[in-house]
């Protein structure tokens, strides 16, 4: 829903002046990225308007594994003033080998709604650390965001996640522990049932966190 995507972008508040980079590693048709473009456009200054406008294209990154959503996302970017959307990649974020993620590719902000309940193919994620090794899609995305995608100091995340990730046991508890040790998980917002179709029966949460300090206080809104 647009109201939620806009709210999440506003909370993360990427800065055009600082040329902050924003990635959605499961971008679908590009809802979070178009909301980010609109947010950044609101920061264009009169003095350096043309330069600012050009910079927006370099601030946005997206990865989508399915062909049709990828195509729609590229079209969506064009409709939002990005002439050559080369930064929208068509691949599966989770099949990139762990050590291929370079420090130089880290971003300031990750805003995403990863697929829930999916199980990745055999062999995917085998190179994750043993204690957080899983084939559950949403959990894998969260580990990757925390460990590999966000800037170490002050990288900001906003992620839609199911209850299982927050309250599950076993590997899920270890994934949550990793998040809370590496990041300041400052806000959790519980959404009413059925907000994110097609997961109508699954309780979902918005998690907002900043990397670089462990979690102390969490605001939990229900």
Predicted regions and their residues:
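Conserved S-adenosyl-L-methionine
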Residues: 2-109, 117-119, 135, 139, ...
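A conserved structural/catalytic subdomain of Rossmann-like adenosyl-cofactor enzymes
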Residues: 101-222
